[in-house]
């Protein structure tokens, strides 16, 4: 610019040579190119999912660690389902309040894009929480010690941030990894967010992602017998 001005060119003439074509970008759903819209709507739900994993695994694992699992089962009538519901429902309520407050801050106070209204995203947040709890129960059922269970939860939760399509598009991944993304609740929440909050598509087109989140609720039933056996017979070794 200074060289051109020294040669007697006007600023308009110089800019025409430096940047002959000006890109006028208006992305759908985020016309301001606000990075906070992208970052907060992806990272914060991932943090919530990770915390649900850890709290679920820890709360069940401590029963095994401190040898209180038999008493816990007795309080639930020796039913693993009743015992899990009694332990996890208060956590569900707390995490749901936190998740809804997160939505209120982002979409209400900060006016982030919410093109399909509140209901689709609040429902997605609730399903993310209960599906993450179901995955957490599965984790501690597979590895019924606090140490290994928490390691599993931490690893799975941290991998979520990179494998579900936040930092690298899923379409560019190996086909095997593309299939594995379906195993993470956060992936389905992210797709719901893109369709409902950003693009404002009809709810019909996102029903499959809601169904996937509900499908994770099957996991505790698959591991329930093994978890109950661990609660009754497993001896914790420091």
Q: Where are these predicted regions, by residue range?
A:
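Transport-system extracytoplasmic interface segments
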Residues: 1-55, 227
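Homeobox/homeodomain signature
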Residues: 8-13, 18, 79, 104, ...
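Juxtamembrane loop-helix boundary motifs flanking transmembrane segments in multi-pass membrane proteins
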Residues: 15, 24, 28-32, 72-85, ...
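Hydrophobic alpha-helical transmembrane segments of multi-pass membrane transport proteins
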Residues: 29-106
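Membrane-spanning alpha-helical segments of multipass transporters and channels
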Residues: 93, 101-105, 112-238
């Amino acid at each position: 610019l200074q060289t051109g001005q020294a040669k007697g060119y006007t600023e308009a003439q110089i800019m025409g040579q430096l940047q002959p074509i000006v890109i006028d970008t208006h992305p759908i759903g985020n016309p301001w190119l606000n990075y906070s819209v992208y970052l907060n709507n992806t990272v914060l739900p991932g943090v919530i999912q990770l915390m649900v994993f850890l709290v679920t695994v820890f709360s069940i694992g401590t029963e095994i660690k401190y040898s209180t699992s038999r008493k816990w089962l007795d309080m639930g009538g020796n039913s693993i389902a009743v015992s899990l519901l009694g332990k996890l429902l208060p956590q569900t309520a707390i995490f749901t309040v936190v998740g809804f407050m997160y939505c209120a801050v982002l979409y209400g106070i900060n006016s982030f894009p919410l093109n399909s209204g509140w209901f689709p995203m609040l429902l997605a947040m609730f399903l993310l929480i209960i599906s993450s709890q179901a995955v957490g129960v599965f984790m501690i059922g597979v590895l019924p010690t606090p140490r290994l269970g928490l390691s599993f939860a931490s690893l799975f939760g941290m991998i979520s941030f990179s494998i579900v399509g936040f930092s690298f598009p899923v379409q560019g991944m190996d086909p095997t990894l593309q299939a594995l993304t379906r195993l993470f609740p956060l992936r389905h929440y992210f797709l719901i967010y893109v369709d409902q909050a950003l693009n404002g598509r009809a709810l019909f087109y996102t029903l499959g992602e809601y169904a996937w989140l509900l499908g994770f609720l099957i996991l505790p039933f698959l591991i329930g017998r093994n978890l109950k056996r661990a609660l009754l017979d497993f001896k914790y070794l420091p």
